[in-house]
Amino acid sequence: NNFSSNLNRYPPQVSKELVEAIAKRYNLDRNKIILGNGSDELISILAQAFLGPDDECIYTEYGFLQFPQAIEIAGAVGVIAKDNHLTVNIDNIIAKITKKTKLIFLANANNPTGTFVPKEEIIRLHKSIPSDVLLVYDAAYSEFIIHPDYIDGSELVNNYENVIMLRTFSKMHGLASLRLGWGYCSNYILDNLMKVRGPFSVNMLAMI
């Protein structure tokens, strides 16, 4: 009854209860969590916030199809890093980094190839990235991986300002139609995303 009586009102910009629940579930800092209308909204606003004309954004050959779409909408230049036998090749990503590079989109684990990049390779990639380049670590399928060499990206976020981990309720939780995703990032990234994120992007039904 309480929910139905509030359907005539706009949803809150941030659901403190949901953020707290996510932070508790994954042992994260609640102040570094941002909600989105699916993680695809977060991908779009990352491109809007951090890319402009002539900027370059690297994405992998068989990564999420929304990566190049978000780059194009932002007016930036998409740079493809070739995979090796349907697996992300870290050396190919590093080789594509230039002075114009602003973002790197990386899905780990990756759909549709079903492959993942091990921890030591992710750490090597991050060490090769200039501090002003943002690594977007899409961990939408992290719950499907039980392997000692896999990391979901949260450890990198806790230690560095230029990483954002993306997660979703669409896959493991089977709630794709609710359009609910979230990101975990530094305050610097979060503040810039909030500047371009719509005030009512996540609906109330998704947040309860």
Annotate each PLM feature.
Residues 34, 58, 79, 136, ...:
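Structural detector of well-ordered beta-strand residues that form the stable sheet scaffold
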Residues 16, 49-106:
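PLP-dependent aminotransferase-like
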Residues 38, 44, 62, 114, ...:
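Short N-terminal helix/helix-N-cap motif within the alpha/beta-hydrolase-1
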Residues 1-41, 45:
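N-terminal small-domain helix-loop-helix segment of the aminotransferase-like
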Residues 24, 48, 52, 69-73, ...:
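Short, well-ordered alpha-helices that flank and scaffold nucleotide-derived cofactor binding pockets
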Residues 72, 90-99, 112-135, 139-172:
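Active-site pre-lysine segment of PLP-dependent enzymes
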Residues 13-14, 162-208:
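PLP-dependent aminotransferase class I/II
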